[in-house]
């Protein structure tokens, strides 16, 4: 069979059906090497394991945490609305005179967390400046943020900003603040 066959695409190109001899040039007196004459099998590429970069794996983990955080925030929002409905009329009238209760601060924080996905120390400080004259409201805000920090799973706290991770696990500090708040308001 000749190297150049007639084919539809052109005269000078070899036909894809033509069998090529071995890579060694043919010399007079030698016969072509067939596939049965070859002693070694053709070299095969080894399959390589797919490697996922640490950065990609970290991004996937962060995305998964963000999804779980969104679910936790939705659950907290449902719980807060339920708590608000369970509040007694006496508590509501007392809080109206006072301003914000712990539950109201938690509802506000959860809404902010749902909308902006961040609770920052600067937001917390601004809220403290607004309610500064009232010691009880200040304690309610601190208590609400501490409770929220302990309700959200610890591995997701880093996604919520810098406020909640700094409050997580500071139970002794909160008890001390509550005692100070009660002693000054009494």
Curated annotation (Swiss-Prot):
Superkingdom assignment: Viruses
Pfam families membership: Paramyxo_NS_C (PF02725)
InterPro entries linked to this entry: Paramyxovir_NSC (IPR003875)
Ranges of Polar residues composition bias in the record: 1-15
GO CC entries: host cell cytoplasmic vesicle; host cell nucleus
GO biological process, one term: symbiont-mediated perturbation of host autophagy
Main localization, broad class: host cell
Region annotated Disordered, chain positions: 1-45
Subcellular location: Host nucleus; Host cytoplasmic vesicle
Keywords associated with the record: Host cytoplasmic vesicle, Host nucleus
UniProt keyword Manganese present: no
Subunit: Interacts with the phosphoprotein (via C-terminus); this interaction allows C to associate with the ribonucleocapsid.
Annotated family: Belongs to the morbillivirus protein C family.
The protein's role, per its UniProt record: Ribonucleocapsid-associated protein that interacts with the phosphoprotein (P), thereby increasing replication accuracy and processivity of the polymerase complex.
Protein name: Protein C
């Amino acid at each position: 069979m000749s190297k150049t066959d007639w084919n539809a695409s052109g005269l000078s190109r070899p036909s894809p059906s033509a069998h090529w001899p071995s890579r060694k040039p043919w010399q007079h007196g030698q016969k072509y090497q067939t596939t049965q004459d070859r002693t070694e099998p053709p070299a095969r590429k080894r399959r390589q394991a797919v490697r996922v970069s640490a950065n990609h794996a970290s991004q996937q983990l962060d995305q998964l945490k963000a999804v779980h955080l969104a679910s936790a925030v939705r659950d907290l929002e449902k719980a807060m609305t339920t708590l608000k409905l369970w509040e007694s009329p006496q508590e509501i009238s007392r809080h109206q005179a006072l301003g914000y209760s712990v539950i109201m601060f938690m509802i506000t924080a959860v809404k902010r967390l749902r909308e902006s996905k961040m609770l920052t120390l600067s937001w917390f400080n601004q809220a403290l400046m607004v309610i500064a004259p009232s010691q009880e409201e200040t304690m309610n805000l601190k208590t609400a943020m501490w409770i929220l920090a302990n309700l959200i799973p610890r591995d997701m706290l880093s996604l919520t900003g810098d406020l909640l991770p700094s409050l997580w696990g500071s139970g002794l500090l909160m008890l001390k603040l509550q005692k100070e708040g009660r002693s000054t308001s009494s």
